[in-house]
Structures are given as structure tokens and as C-alpha cells.
Amino acid sequence: NSNFWQNRLEINRIFLLQNKRWILGSVFLAIILLLPIFILFGELFSVQESSFFYLWDNLLIDYTFNTFYLLILTSFFSLLFGILPAWLITNYKFKGRNILDVILYLPLAIPTYIMAFTYSDMLSYTGPIQSFFRNNFVEFSTIFNRDYLQIEFLGLLMALSLYPYIYTSSRVSFSLLGSNYMDLSKNLGVSKFKSFFKILIPLSRPAIFSGLFLVLMEVLNEYGAVKYFGVNTYTTGIFRSWFSMGDIGTAIQL
């Protein structure tokens, strides 16, 4: 009995030592990751109040509205472009399905600002699309003759670039959940349309929202595309305050 308890105490001591090492390592890693945030919060309370009131009166409302409007637009189109193709690829078999599945991932390989520049140039007045319609179908040329450097078009382009985040998570979730629950609902006489919205979508919410979260983070940190479109967001405001105006305090507040 004495040997048993001695061995038990020794084992507990070893596990306790290992747990302490893991805890200390986790705390050290967390401090390293959170250190920039702590520094920003520390600097936030040391900036001049005049810059804060200038920011509030002249810039903050515009930055806030544009940022949230762009988030809403991109989220809506990303969910649309991500969930529906994932559903079709998962539940239907057709020719070229595997090739289409690979193609739907490719927008992640293209930077958002390059996609925004390319599409806006193609659709511009001197671009190939409007030039083609002016030369061949004059009556339809006015349909495309518009200013595309607008926040609505930017939200659509960013969704075309970022929807694979939602497509990937939705595709995996539909593959794992789809067959079992869809077969059960089919046996109960429920249509595929109702099963999709009432069963599969609610069960796949965690996966969908995880992809949507990544989309939102990408929209918030995007600079090149919003700068090219001339849309004032928090990111462009930070760059303008820090590098153009040399006002680090206002950049930190943003």
C-alpha cells in the first residue's frame, strides 16, 4: 500500500509539473499575441482630446457608415455565392462537377484589389465590354454606361473574391450532414427545398458563420480595393492618418 501511494503521489507530481509548464507556456504565448493590442489601448488614453473631437466631428460618421455598409453588402453576396454552389456541388451529380468544385476555390488565389481593378477596368467606358456594345449594339450600350466605382459594386467584387471561405465551410458541413438528414426528410415526404432551409441550414450555422467571420475580417483589413474605389473606411482612415498626415494618435483611435 505504501508503494502504491508513493507511486500515485509521484505520478500526480509529474502531471502537476507538466500542467504548470503548459499553463506557463500558454500564458506566455497569449501575452506575445496580445501585446500589440495592450500597447494600442495604452496609447489610446494618452492621445490629445483635440484630435479625438476632430475625428468625431469630421470623419468618424463617414468611416463608420461606409465600413458597416460594405460589411453588410459583402456578407450578403458572399453568403449567396458560397452557400448555393456548396449545396449544388454536394447534393447533385452532373458532368464537370469536380472541375467546378476546384474552380470555385480559385478566387482565394487572386488578391481582392487586383480583382477590383480588373473588373472595374473591364467595365469602364474605355474597357472591352462597353466598347464592344458601343460598336455592335448601340441600343444596349447605355445599360453598361455607368460609374462602377461605387461602394455597392465594391461589395459585390469583394464577395466574388472572398466567398470561398463560406463555400469551403458550407461544403464540408453539407457533406457531413447532408446525406443522412436529407434521406430522413425525404422518407418523411419533405421536399428538398424545405429540407435545405429548415434542416440543413440551421444545422450548418456554426460552419457558415465561421466562414462569414473570416470574410468580415478580410473586409475590415482590406486597403487596396477600397482605396482604389475611393471609399472611406476605418482601414483607409488609419493609413491616411498615420502615413499621409503623420497623426499616430488619430490612427490609434480609429
Name each region found by the language model.
Residues 1-16:
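Short, Lys/Arg-rich, polar N-terminal cytosolic tail immediately upstream
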Residues 8, 12, 50-56:
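A short amphipathic helical element positioned immediately N-terminal to and/or at the very start
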Residues 17-47, 58-174, 203-223, 251-253:
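Membrane-water interface segments at the C-terminal ends of transmembrane alpha-helices
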Residues 50-54, 101, 134-138, 179-187, ...:
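Short amphipathic alpha-helical coupling elements at transmembrane boundaries
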Residues 95, 190-191:
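Short coil/turn motifs that cap or connect alpha-helices
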Residues 188-190, 202:
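Glycine/proline-centered hinge or cleavage motifs at structural transition points of membrane proteins
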Residues 194-195:
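Helix-loop-helix "hairpin" substructures at the membrane interface of multi-pass membrane proteins
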Residues 223-254:
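Interhelical loop and adjacent transmembrane-helix boundary motif
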